[in-house]
Amino acid sequence: MTLITHAKRAVRKPGHRRPLAVAALLALCVTATLITLVFRAAHGPPAAAPTIDLEEHIREYIRHFPSDHEYRIPDAAQRAQVSEGIADIVDGRLDAAGRPLSEAGYTVRTVRLAGSHRMVAQVAEATGRGAQPRGWGEVFVDLGRRVQWSAQVPHPVSDQHTELLGAELFSRAPGGVLVLAGANRDAGRGNAADVAHRQDSVFQAVCAALAARRIPGIQVHGFADDSSPGNDVVVSAGPGEVGPGVREAARSLSSAGFTVCRAWDQDCGRLEGTTNVQARTAAADDVPFLHVENSRSVRDSRTARSRLAAALAEVARQLAKGGFTAA
């Protein structure tokens, strides 16, 4: 009997310890839950990315462009900082981009384009107390896929509605970058703010960083109707080789109903873009570049502008697929 009793007691001992183990486990779970709740209460839920109507944003943005002589030429360090930040974003290092951009007086945030699920990085000049108008522009980078093309707007306001054309083009074709100058081309002393013809601008620093990564550019401009009579659009490669992308762009625009002047075999009224700094940079890097001049009549018509953006967006999609080469 004594042996049996001891044996029964030996069997019961693990059973006595099991409730203690369960209680300890429950205590750990409760503690972990409390810690999680406290952390969430302190930091709040992840903030949803703000939605931005790109066209409305740009319309408001250009209203606050610098006045005459307020444009400031960025120094070499500032241009390098912006270039580094944009390169970080394009290379998928969004978190790393904040430091160099902030050093140049820029902010970066993620926004969602209205009417879509596309998330983009918005790079903008810092505002608030002490901020001075500089006119260096904004950049939008598609975060949904690898960057493969860019829309460039060097003369917003001066070439009226090219800023809206660039915005619609960027919105229609994924995988792009929108590079928007931040001042009227006459806002600086001399041609200081004419970023299409200056090496020392943030605009050029960004476009050069993209060209260094072999990202093609579509740059939109505007001309007075009487500068190239009878033409809606003038297409060229600037000083670069006229490759398949440039020729295909001309065909696409013609198919969309526009009268297209092909600068490589027609007299288009000196609108070829041969002195364009971004075009020269792309040519030096053997990167496809499309220089598109648009008549005032086309730019002033919302319908025509949308048809133009749709045709250029198809060219951008082909660029993204690697369908064209520089030569």
Task: Enumerate the language-model features and the residues they cover.
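Secretory targeting and sorting signals
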Residues: M1-T2, H6, A10-R40
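N-terminal catalytic or cofactor-binding beta/alpha core of small enzyme domains
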Residues: V38-P288, S295-A326
